[in-house]
Curated annotation (Swiss-Prot):
rRNA-binding as UniProt keyword: yes
Keywords: Ribonucleoprotein, Ribosomal protein, RNA-binding, rRNA-binding
Higher taxonomy: Bacteria, Pseudomonadati, Pseudomonadota, Betaproteobacteria, Neisseriales
One GO-annotated biological process of the protein: translation
Family: Belongs to the universal ribosomal protein uL18 family.
Protein name per its UniProtKB record: Large ribosomal subunit protein uL18
Record-linked SUPFAM superfamilies: Translational machinery components
CDD domains documented for this protein: Ribosomal_L18_L5e
Function in brief: This is one of the proteins that bind and probably mediate the attachment of the 5S RNA into the large ribosomal subunit, where it forms part of the central protuberance.
Gene giving rise to this polypeptide: rplR
């Protein structure tokens, strides 16, 4: 198995566990150039809030969308948008990525700004 297939297998297992909990989930996707975060309803059919380094407000203030500082800004924005949508508690779905670097920075920034998981 290659790295990509292994990551997808881990993500599938995690999402199955979160689906059993019937909780709203904070889903993170990391590409080489950007980072994306979505708050998805417990049923999995609606996106309640989203933030990424592609947003105009975020993009203008960053030199690069693929570093820890950019991830922290996205974490702060997703927490603010989730709270505005009435979401306080989420399950963290790291999409099979290691809890390290950009993924960790996004999660910690979201926690500091009011999301609990």
């Amino acid at each position: 198995m290659d790295k990509h297939t292994t990551r997808l297998r881990r993500a599938r297992k995690t999402r199955a566990r979160i689906a059993d909990l019937k909780m709203v989930r904070l889903c993170v996707f990391r590409s080489n150039n950007h980072i994306y975060a979505q708050v998805i309803s417990a049923e999995g059919d609606k996106v309640l809030a989203q933030a990424s380094t592609l947003e105009a407000e975020v993009r203008g203030s960053l030199k690069s969308g693929s570093n820890v500082e950019a991830a922290a800004i996205v974490g702060k924005r997703i927490a603010e948008k989730a709270k505005a949508a009435g979401v306080e508690k989420v399950a963290f779905d790291r999409s099979g990525f290691q809890y390290h670097g950009r993924v960790k920075a996004l999660a910690e920034a979201a926690r500091e700004n009011g999301l609990s998981f």
